[in-house]
Amino acid sequence: MAQIDFRKKINWHRRYRSPQGVKTEHEILRIFESDRGRIINSPAIRRLQQKTQVFPLERNAAVRTRLTHSMEVQQVGRYIAKEILSRMKELKLLEAYGLDELTGPFESIVEMSCLMHDIGNPPFGHFGEAAINDWFRQRLHPEDAESQPLTDDRCSVAALRLRDGEEPLNELRRKIRQDLCHFEGNAQGIRLVHTLMRMNLTWAQVGGILKYTRPAWWRGETPETHHYLMKKPGYYLSEEAYIARLRKELNLALYSRFPLTWIMEAADDISYCVADLEDAVEKRIFTVEQLYHHLHEAWGQHEKGSLFSLVVENAWEKSRSNSLSRSTEDQFFMYLRVNTLNKLVPYAAQRFIDNLPAIFAGTFNHALLEDASECSDLLKLYKNVAVKHVFSHPDVEQLELQGYRVISGLLEIYRPLLSLSLSDFTELVEKERVKRFPIESRLFHKLSTRHRLAYVEAVSKLPSDSPEFPLWEYYYRCRLLQDYISGMTDLYAWDEYRRLMAVEQ
């Protein structure tokens, strides 16, 4: 196992216009303060205001949005980071691990990774993801990529259909089809900060949001040693070269994760479990009393000093005894959150320290809060109650189905842009209005300038006389559409769908 030295991981250089020379502790901290400013002031963070956590299109301001959730995750991430650094200081490990002058950047990277962790999520969350992937699968049929004979390939896009005698091109076709059918919020987050927003963050800060290490074009089984880290797609073909450079700059082996990402993940796990239950009470899906009984029933028999007793029962008893001064709801969730954090944050911090050799190497193939402990059981309890009583509620399911229909419908509305030939679409991009394509011209005008420029830049770098050019052009055209629709807020997607379907003016 390589020696642990965080100076080799907390890389303060940037992809473009990077600061040069050896920096003092204060100068390095200023570089990460610049990252904070770029992130907090970015439109991607502001759009989280109108993307909801569990309840799409929610008008009740007390129910969490992706932004308020991300701020809560940021606070928990800061708490865990401080706990880790405090324990390392007590053990006299800060200097040994190269952290004695990097505690500020350590905390800042964790905080900003937490704030950014949801920026790539499409409207309507996982149902938006599913809608995008299902729509593209129905047209690209990535499962036919190994079809024999090749004439069995059902792909409806001529440029991406497998052809006899074109094996090198066929392999690229397989990768592109697989990649486009695996849209994922975390991978889109990487694309946002690097390709679309061009935020030029430090290598370490981007490493903090590379949650999964599986390429989106991956086919087949993942290695047993990395099955958790490669559970979902982490980046797209379009960012392959950037991620290769990121790995080099952060000393990451293939399919390995940046150490501070485990802290961001733990902060998210702790935050959303309690938050989803609190939002459900705010939405009157169940009362606090009903929630307590759901939790009690799901946990089962327990001793007086058990974790359930110390966290959930304690919160319930305190909230009832103070019910005259404040509402039982507010009191219960305040105590539940405090009790949960007081148990889970120190546990997550200790797990990080205990497993630091594997975490530093990027190969720890688990979440910090997924093990055989009572702390892990407590998180599972919150998640299971939410799945059983919140996510399966008819109101929630109806909104999710509506969200799926909205995203599918928007993709269908913009499909004419994908149906144009390469030469016709190139003409449309150059002229912005082509008389013989009135519908396509108007659809193209609706696309965001930022996304259109990203497409133009990507395609302009390709050699137009290469046999691969039509494949890559179509790939980036699909990305253009995915970028535009996934970047919408819930409300904008809903309104746009209704307008374009002529439901309202």
Swiss-Prot record:
Q: Which cofactor does it need?
A: Mg(2+)
Q: How does it assemble?
A: Homotetramer.
Its name, as the record gives it, is Deoxyguanosinetriphosphate triphosphohydrolase
Q: What SUPFAM superfamilies does this protein map onto? A: HD-domain/PDEase-like
**This protein's UniProt keywords:** Hydrolase, Magnesium
Q: Which family does it belong to?
A: Belongs to the dGTPase family. Type 1 subfamily.
Report the PANTHER family cross-referenced here: DEOXYGUANOSINETRIPHOSPHATE TRIPHOSPHOHYDROLASE, DEOXYNUCLEOSIDE TRIPHOSPHATE TRIPHOSPHOHYDROLASE
EC numbers for this chain: 3.1.5.1
GO biological process per UniProt: dGTP catabolic process
User: Residue limits of the HD domain?
Assistant: 66-273
The UniProt catalytic activity note for this protein reads: dGTP + H2O = 2'-deoxyguanosine + triphosphate + H(+)
Q: Which SMART domains match?
A: HDc
**Which molecular function GO terms apply here?**
dGTPase activity; magnesium ion binding
Give yes or no: UniProt keyword Cytoplasm: no
Upper lineage is:
Bacteria, Pseudomonadati, Pseudomonadota, Gammaproteobacteria, Enterobacterales
Function as written in the Swiss-Prot or TrEMBL entry: dGTPase preferentially hydrolyzes dGTP over the other canonical NTPs.
